[in-house]
């Protein structure tokens, strides 16, 4: 055990004790960056090992969110750009996605905490077996409303806006709506995330300071927090620091 671990535990307790429950972000979105770099640092040439560790980290983060009363989590798992990665890595990722979505139906913790699971993105780009697994996961949790976990997979924020405007244009062409009726609410209703509250806080790991196409429309007034830790190495103290930073900010919403 690291000699610093007891100190971090004490620090975790201190931060958690001073967080205000009435100022907790309701929706936290996460860019889970750094899995591949983690694999290399561990001496593995197989990036899938880093992605497996990343899934374990996501499970821990979801537990922390339950403890803190955070109701909505959106995790950026796989972008449309990621399809350009080596074929072996993409196939390995799809296998991981399929296995983990399939496991949701029998996950006791998911059902105990009444967590609804949803996938958002251009899902038609995914292999059929992954889409079936997503359908199983969504169907097995659709009755829950206490908490919501969105997995952004096959997702790109620009493409999301393009697809939304294309659907609206088709409705205009069909005479279902007038161009004058188009407003922000209509665009919101046609996004992959339709019906989802905008994120209050977006966290990105690995030290990169950009959104990389994540929730571009929805993040106008989101607070951003960048963490140096690689995603598989994220500690609870890192997550608590992000929440503390959010609570220390004054949200102006453009005013």
Swiss-Prot record:
Cited function: Catalyzes the sequential condensation of isopentenyl diphosphate (IPP) with geranylgeranyl diphosphate (GGPP) to yield (2Z,6Z,10Z,14Z,18Z,22Z,26Z,30E,34E,38E)-undecaprenyl diphosphate (tritrans,heptacis-UPP). It is probably the precursor of glycosyl carrier lipids.
NCBIfam families reported in the protein's UniProt record: uppS (TIGR00055)
Lineage: Archaea, Methanobacteriati, Methanobacteriota, Methanomada group, Methanobacteria
Protein name: Tritrans,polycis-undecaprenyl-diphosphate synthase (geranylgeranyl-diphosphate specific)
Cofactor: Mg(2+)
HAMAP family per the UniProt record, alphabetical: ISPT
GO molecular function: ditrans,polycis-polyprenyl diphosphate synthase [(2E,6E)-farnesyl diphosphate specific] activity; magnesium ion binding
Subunit structure: Homodimer.
Cofactor note: Binds 2 magnesium ions per subunit.
Active site as annotated: 33, 82
Chain ranges passing through the membrane: none
Pfam families the UniProt entry points to: Prenyltransf
């Amino acid at each position: 055990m690291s000699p610093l671990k007891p100190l971090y535990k004490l620090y975790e307790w201190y931060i958690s004790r001073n967080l205000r429950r009435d100022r907790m972000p309701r929706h936290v979105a996460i860019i889970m960056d750094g899995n591949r770099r983690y694999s290399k640092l561990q001496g593995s040439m197989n990036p899938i090992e880093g992605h497996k560790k990343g899934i374990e980290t996501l499970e821990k983060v979801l537990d922390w969110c339950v403890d803190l009363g955070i109701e909505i989590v959106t995790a950026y798992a796989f972008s449309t750009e990621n399809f350009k990665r080596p074929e072996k890595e993409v196939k390995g990722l799809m296998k991981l996605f399929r296995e983990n979505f399939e496991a949701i139906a029998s996950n006791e913790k998911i059902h105990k905490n009444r967590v609804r699971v949803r996938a958002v993105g251009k899902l038609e780009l995914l292999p059929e077996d992954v889409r079936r697994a997503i359908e199983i996961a969504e169907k097995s949790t659709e009755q829950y409303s206490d908490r919501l976990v969105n997995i952004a997979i096959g997702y790109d924020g620009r493409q999301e806006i393009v697809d939304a405007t294309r659907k609206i244009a088709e409705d205009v062409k069909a005479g279902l709506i007038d161009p004058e009726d188009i407003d922000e609410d209509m665009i919101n209703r046609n996004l992959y995330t339709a019906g989802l509250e905008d994120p209050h806080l977006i966290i990105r790991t690995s030290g990169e300071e950009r959104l990389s196409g994540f929730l571009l429309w929805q993040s106008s007034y989101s607070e951003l927090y960048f963490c140096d830790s690689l995603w598989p190495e994220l500690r609870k103290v890192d997550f608590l620091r992000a929440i503390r930073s959010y609570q220390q900010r004054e949200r102006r919403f453009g005013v």
